[in-house]
Amino acid sequence: MAQSLALSLLILVLAFGIPGTQGSDGGAQDCCLKYSQRKIPAKVVRSYRKQEPSLGCSIPAILFLPRKRSQAELCADPKELWVQQLMQHLDKTPTPRKPVQGCRKDRGVPKNGKKGKGCKRTEQSQTPKGP
């Protein structure tokens, strides 16, 4: 009796404790089931991610993330030339950074005598403190 109880507990521990038995990442994963039939314009896309069949999805795909976060991801066939070109374009395009208000060329120099938050912090970090 004790052996069968111990064996049952061992089976339960193994069944629930081994990664991969509940899915590739331990939870639900969004997968593309089919590809978009139309070309996706670069101006509506901010980035992309790859979907691999080895990660639990049925087809390989590129999921393009739209600029508007409220819109759904767009699925495309990674073998298509336009998809590869769009991926290369996104890889080359740097993420836009907002300039610091009130500073010139991020040097910590205030514009027209105005002190901005970024300028003050930059000046403090560049000014050596000592006797």
UniProtKB/Swiss-Prot annotation:
One of its GO terms (molecular function) is chemokine activity. Monomer. Binds to CCR7. Interacts with PDPN; relocalizes PDPN to the basolateral membrane. Interacts with TNFAIP6 (via Link domain). Interacts with GPR174. This is C-C motif chemokine 21. Pfam families: IL8. Residues 89-131 are annotated as: Disordered. SUPFAM superfamilies: Interleukin 8-like chemokines (SSF54117). Belongs to the intercrine beta (chemokine CC) family. Keywords: Chemotaxis, Cytokine, Disulfide bond, Inflammatory response, Secreted, Signal. GO terms for biological process: antimicrobial humoral immune response mediated by antimicrobial peptide; CCL21-activated CCR7 signaling pathway; cellular response to prostaglandin E stimulus; chemokine-mediated signaling pathway; dendritic cell chemotaxis; eosinophil chemotaxis; establishment of T cell polarity; inflammatory response. It is found in: Secreted. GO terms for cellular component: extracellular space. InterPro entries: Chemokine_b/g/d, Chemokine_CC_DCCL, Chemokine_IL8-like_dom, Interleukin_8-like_sf. Disulfide bonds join C31-C57, C32-C75, C103-C119. The keyword Aminoacyl-tRNA synthetase does not apply. Residues 1-23 form the signal peptide. Inhibits hemopoiesis and stimulates chemotaxis. Chemotactic in vitro for thymocytes and activated T-cells, but not for B-cells, macrophages, or neutrophils. Shows preferential activity towards naive T-cells. May play a role in mediating homing of lymphocytes to secondary lymphoid organs. Binds to atypical chemokine receptor ACKR4 and mediates the recruitment of beta-arrestin (ARRB1/2) to ACKR4. The gene is CCL21.
